Amino acid sequence: MVRNALAAAVLSALLSGPVLAQEASPPPPPPAPTDWRAISPSDLLVIDTSKGRILVELAPELAPAHVERIKLLAARGFYDNLAWHRVIDWFMAQTGDPLGTGDGQSWYPDLKGEFTFRRGPDMAFTPVAAPTGALIGFVRSVPVQTQPDDLMAGTGDKKVHGWGLYCPGVAGMARDEGNDTANSQFFLMRQAYPALDKRYTVWGRVVSGLDVVRALKASPTPDGIVTEPDRMTRVRLAADLPQAERPTVQMMNTTSAAFRALVDQARQAKGADFSVCDIDIPAQVTPGA
C-alpha cells in the first residue's frame, strides 16, 4: 500500500563534521520592492491544521496533472479534517487518506507519475550551481536539477529533462509500489531526503509554515503511524477563499540581485558542503482574516 511504498525510504542518521570558523561576512543590503514577486492566488494552497497554517506554492510546470488533482480535491473539500496519519521526524509528514490508515484514496483514477519534466528556454529557471553535466536551481520556489541549456539544440522538442529535489518543505505525492498509482495522498518534507528524487512526483513547496510541518505530531515508531494525529482542518486554494480571508505571499524573486546575494552568502557559509537545500527563499506573508 501507499504507506509501505514510502516506508522503504527510512531516513539514515545524519553525521556532521567539525565546523571551521570563518570570518563573518557583511549582511547583504535589504531587498528592494522590485526584488519580490507575488504568488498567484490560483497557485497558493492554504492548508489550515490543528497546529497552524501551511502555505504551499504549486508548481504546474513540474507536475501539471498532480497540481490539477490537488486543486480539484481542495475545491471539493476532500482534504478537510483528514489526519496527518504518517509522520516521521527528520523525514516527512503524510496525509490525504480519508481512511486515516495509509490505504485510502479519492474516487478519482490514479495518476501517471510525473517524476521528471521538460524544461525549455521559455521556462523561468534560476541556476545556482553547475555541477558537471547539470544545472541546479529553482523553478518558482521549488529546487530542481536539470540538464544544461546547451543540450536543448539537440533534442526534438528543444527541451531538456529536469526533476524536483526533495529539500525541506518540498511537496510530493505518495503512491503505491507502481509508478502510476498516486491519487490523493501527499507528503511535505520536514528535512531533505535526496533518495526520493525522481521516484516521487514533486508538485510544490511550502513557502510559509515549515515550522508547522515540523510541529505536527510524529510517530515514536519507524513506520511513522501516528495515534491521535494532528489534522488538516481546511484546505483551499487562496483564490477560492473570500477576499477578506485570503492570504497573500510575496516571494523574493530568484532573478533579483538580492537573491544572488543570498545565494553567495549561503555558499560562503557552507563552503564545499553547499547545497541548494541550504537556500531559504524569503517570503512576506499577509495572513488574511
Regions found by a protein language model. Name each.
Residues 21-289:
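Cyclophilin-like peptidyl-prolyl cis-trans isomerases
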